[in-house]
Amino acid sequence: QIQKQLLRLSHLEEALLVLSRLDSGTLILQREEVDVFTVLVLASDNLQELLTATGTSVDIPELGGMAITVDLDWTMEAVMNLMKNCMEHNPGGTIHCAYEQNPLYTEIRIWDEGAGFLKEDMPYLFERFYRGRNAHEGGIGIGLALAKEILKRQNGTIRATNKQGAGACFEIRLYSH
């Protein structure tokens, strides 16, 4: 139990340092051209232990080469935070991914088959330290805020919606210019 709490505090400290560096503009992003499919697969691979422990699968279709210019490691971090959120609210289910590109932006969607977001939580989901009413017990309310800041620094946006029927959906847009 103590080891678990120490790990949690260490993760909190690390996340706060990253947010601080993002706020101050001192986090250097090493942008390179990478394929969207690669980003999603690498993010999923980094979560494999957690996915296996919760019996959660990830569906990532290979839709042909779609390049984005991002910092691979930090973009993976943002995507992993979204996937973790889906996993925590739909253990044993499937996390779905889809993506498409047009001349203005690349859109990446990540969604689950859970209950979706509560209406009263929607305006606050990306605020630091906000924990929704159905928040995972061990969460600290940093993951979605961190994902938003990482994407914003790369000319991106993120929004959360509820899928028709059931499930929470994150929509990322990474603009070309």
Regions found by a protein language model. Give the residues of each.
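Short helix-loop "hinge" at the ATP-lid/N-box region of the Bergerat-fold HATPase_c
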Residues: N85-M87
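Short beta-strand/loop element within the Bergerat-fold HATPase_c
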Residues: T94-L104
